[in-house]
Amino acid sequence: VLGLAPGANIGKEAAIFEAVHGSAPDIAGRKIANPCALLLAAAQMLTHLDMADRAERLRKAIAETISAGDRTTPDLGGTGNTDQFADAIIERL
């Protein structure tokens, strides 16, 4: 499933955090992209920056939102759009 895998490239002097997936031209402009991979990459970044407590809060909010299922994107079986999914995660923070 696109949109679930975070990625990190960590070197001695720099670190880059990103979503790990290809493009999805079939959903371009439809506002149904799953934001989880990018948010999970942000959680990895927070951990890297010694903010593990904040990273855990974000991961928990994402997991709770997926479990609730009411505003997830169609790729996760929901009927929500990207904004609704992200808003639901923010509300749980």
Residues of each region from the PLM?
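Short, amphipathic C-terminal "tail helix"
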Residues: 73-93
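Glycine-rich phosphate/nucleotide-binding loop
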Residues: 1-57, 61-70
